[in-house]
């Protein structure tokens, strides 16, 4: 119920012990889910990067949408896609792991652990999200390149990585705690709710209808999760915009932002409406592209 349409198309498990494990072994060995996740991420980043930049400025400075857009206009078209390489590398890698590892780990846990499917799927989702966090340095560099305060310090991904090197390996993983929390819980909700949501949509009878349903399903989930985890991303962005100095805890940074924004919840969610629409489009594209590629590859 909680698995994707690709799960439903797997060969049925037979009673013979020899035949019982072969579908799972075959699925674990496949790279299709990794490739589809990678391509879906590339498609998404290329389309939505300018929107993400506006959102980033709002998260970091607490400014309005119009002011963030004006900042980007002043930066010029030349800088519009500045910093796209880290998210492109990060998203293609992490989404490949997110979809691929989830499928593989779900099969392995289901085979070796006598627990309800929702439990094994949940554990697989958390483990996939935790593995994604290995690539935190890419998200870290993306934050620095998008922050106009650092424009004069480095102009490309290589220079940004080099600037962090002198501060030690820990500097690359600044902001790891909120990323681990966000990845694990959001993966559980995404994979757990994707199936039930699609089941409640009108039955698709054509390829285009399936594509629309997959877009709606992914978009609704992405928008909901993007809004739910927005404050965590605000804190994560603030933590990762710093180079060197004290490693401040999540509660400490949250308290500082809370005071800066007059202790008003609405100010903490400044930019959330744009994030909602970006996530709606972004995860709609990701889910629709992923499911489409699963059928054609």
Swiss-Prot record:
It catalyses: NAD(+)(in) = NAD(+)(out). Changing residue 205 to M: In a breast cancer sample; somatic mutation. Pfam families: Mito_carr (PF00153). Keywords: Membrane, Mitochondrion, Mitochondrion inner membrane, Repeat, Transmembrane, Transmembrane helix, Transport. GO terms for cellular component: mitochondrial inner membrane; mitochondrion. The keyword Mitochondrion applies. It is a multi-pass membrane protein. The keyword Disulfide bond does not apply. One of its GO terms (molecular function) is NAD transmembrane transporter activity. The chain crosses the membrane at residues 36-56, 85-105, 116-135, 179-199, 215-235, 268-289. Residues 1-11 have a biased composition (Basic and acidic residues). It is found in: Mitochondrion inner membrane. InterPro entries: Mito_NAD+_Carrier, Mitochondrial_sb/sol_carrier, Mt_carrier_dom_sf. Mitochondrial membrane carrier protein that mediates the import of NAD(+) into mitochondria. Mitochondrial NAD(+) is required for glycolysis and mitochondrial respiration. Compared to SLC25A52, SLC25A51-mediated transport is essential for the import of NAD(+) in mitochondria. The transport mechanism, uniport or antiport, its electrogenicity and substrate selectivity, remain to be elucidated. Belongs to the mitochondrial carrier (TC 2.A.29) family. This is Mitochondrial nicotinamide adenine dinucleotide transporter SLC25A51. It comes from Homo sapiens.
